[in-house]
Amino acid sequence: MFNWVKTAMLMAAITALFIVIGGMIGGSRGMTIALLFALGMNFFSYWFSDKMVLRMYNAQEVDENTAPQFYRMVRELATRANLPMPRVYLINEDAPNAFATGRNPEHAAVAATTGILRVLSEREMRGVMAHELAHVKHRDILISTITATMAGAISAIANFAMFFGGRDENGRPANPIAGIAVALLAPIAGALIQMAISRAREFEADRGGAQISGDPQSLATALDKIHRYAAGIPFQAAEQHPATAQMMIMNPLHGGGLQNLFSTHPATEERIARLMEMARTGRFD
């Protein structure tokens, strides 16, 4: 129930941001258009955003015949977590990473890159997929997928405002400063919304994943490996769709500046330290 409240609050916040942007670009008419656009995006995000994200990454669905070891691993972990079997996808990318998406546990999907399967041991891979299934169990996946879709739309509108400006109620060109302000501030606002919901979720998914797998140390060593390997391997699809970065187990973006300042993931060192403490004490609270 609480996650439905968070989802509703997220949709309301992003709708309000759309309306503000619309008003800055086109006055009251722009606000009306932005409201209608936001309502349409909310509907689309709920029903179709997971399919869009998987398509962005050219993810290929696999089964017990095409990826038997990986598929059986996910099935065993889903059983341990008392979850329905999610759809399982592979992404042909060297960069090691993984994510979960969908609107609820009954309509969930997990995806991993071919790179992460090469880099991690079987135990470490179990830790990673348990982390992703924890996102499913906690019903984080709808929030993260909607946020990725809407943040991408906000960036597109900001770019439109920067290059084409807008019109006021009388059809005259809007203040160009407003367009520049929208282009600069809208992506920051979108990033702040992502930050507000992403960092705490990752700690909770680490804890939940450690409970599902029963092996917090393997998730800790997996995070360390992913962090080290990913630093030297660009993730092209993620760079092209930066709004989806917060869905990943590890931030896949390599840019500096705002991308580091507004990182949607907590520090890897802190995540590892918390997991190693769980391994030492045997406590997951």
From Swiss-Prot:
One of its GO terms (cellular component) is plasma membrane. It is found in: Cell inner membrane. GO terms for biological process: proteolysis. The keyword Transmembrane applies. The chain crosses the membrane at residues 7-27, 30-50, 146-166, 177-197. GO terms for molecular function: metalloendopeptidase activity; zinc ion binding. It holds the Pfam family Peptidase_M48. Keywords: Cell inner membrane, Cell membrane, Hydrolase, Membrane, Metal-binding, Metalloprotease, Protease, Transmembrane, Transmembrane helix, Zinc. The keyword Iron-sulfur does not apply. Binds 1 zinc ion per subunit. Gene3D superfamilies: Metalloproteases ('zincins'), catalytic domain. It is a multi-pass membrane protein. The active site is at 132. InterPro entries: HtpX_protease (IPR050083), Pept_M48_protease_HtpX (IPR022919), Peptidase_M48 (IPR001915). PANTHER family: PROTEASE HTPX. NCBIfam families: PRK01345.1, PRK03001.1. HAMAP family: Pept_M48_protease_HtpX. This is Protease HtpX homolog. It comes from Burkholderia lata (strain ATCC 17760 / DSM 23089 / LMG 22485 / NCIMB 9086 / R18194 / 383).
